[in-house]
């Protein structure tokens, strides 16, 4: 069976696509170009995914997710990491894990200090501002590893969802020894949408969170030690979610 080509977008159409369809998918080379660095520069961030901490908050009883989480404020001139804080979502956006403060391990200092990290986040923040000029942005960064040690790993155990922010980026970091993990993006108010499987490291999906819902299907092992690594970034105007809860 022939795999259909991914719906990649020319980066010059990024702003228009987010306004018109609510999402945009960029090739790895274009992500590096947007960030003003090389793919080898971005690759220097990848080893930190081998040092994520177990997510103890999964309500489905699973132990298939490892993660780190940190927060930043992007005012257009600088990107500043905030003191470490818990991640919070309302139950309206996360029926499984909403309504609870989840304090995850912070991102490693060396990862945040890597010049490629700031370049990537500031470039994507500028892309968000081109659609919605709402700086400062309150940015949350989530490093994820979903593994198949227990047979099945669920990238989005909460199902198809929105995140309650302005924009969401899902970046493929790597896949090893798995099948599945299909990404699905649908109109928030209708049945139309896209489904595709991101396989190349640094493929980027950028979403207008108010316009679309998204999910990734479970992964299954093709051998031992299967996993799927992603970086999820969110941008929200006004404040972090849960700041006054």
Q: Predicted segment positions?
A:
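N-terminal auxiliary "cap/dimerization" subdomain that precedes the catalytic jelly-roll/cupin core
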Residues: 1-91
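Generic detector of solvent-exposed, compositionally biased contiguous segments
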Residues: 3-9, 134-155, 203-216
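Short, well-ordered loop/turn elements at secondary-structure boundaries
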Residues: 20, 163-166, 200-201, 227
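Structured loops at beta-to-helix junctions and adjacent beta-edge loops in soluble globular domains
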Residues: 29, 74-76, 142-144, 172, ...
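Signature of the catalytic double-stranded beta-helix
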Residues: 74-140
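Catalytic core of non-heme Fe(II) oxygenases with the double-stranded beta-helix
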Residues: 131-198
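Catalytic core of Fe(II)/2-oxoglutarate
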Residues: 182-245
């Amino acid at each position: 069976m022939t795999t259909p080509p991914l719906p990649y977008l020319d980066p010059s159409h990024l702003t228009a696509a987010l306004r018109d369809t609510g999402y945009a998918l960029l090739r790895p080379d274009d992500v590096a170009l947007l960030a003003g660095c090389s793919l080898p520069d971005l690759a220097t961030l990848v080893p930190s995914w081998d040092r994520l901490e177990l997510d103890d908050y999964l309500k489905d009883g699973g132990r298939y997710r490892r993660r780190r989480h940190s927060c930043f404020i992007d005012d257009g001139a600088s990107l500043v990491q905030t003191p470490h804080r818990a991640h919070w979502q309302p139950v309206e956006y996360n029926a499984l894990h909403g309504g609870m403060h989840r304090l995850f391990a912070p991102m490693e200092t060396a990862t945040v200090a890597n010049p490629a990290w700031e370049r990537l986040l500031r470039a994507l923040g500028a892309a968000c501002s081109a659609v919605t000029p709402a700086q400062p942005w309150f940015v949350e960064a989530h490093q994820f590893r979903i593994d198949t040690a227990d047979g099945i790993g669920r990238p989005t155990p909460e199902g198809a969802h929105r995140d309650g922010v302005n924009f969401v980026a899902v970046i493929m970091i790597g896949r090893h020894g798995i099948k599945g993990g299909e990404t699905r993006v649908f109109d928030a108010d209708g049945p139309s949408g896209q489904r595709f499987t991101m396989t190349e490291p640094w493929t980027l999906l950028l979403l207008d969170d108010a316009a679309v819902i998204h999910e990734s299907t479970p992964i299954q092992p093709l051998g031992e030690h299967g996993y799927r690594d992603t970086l999820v970034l969110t941008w929200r105007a006004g404040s972090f979610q849960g700041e006054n809860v």
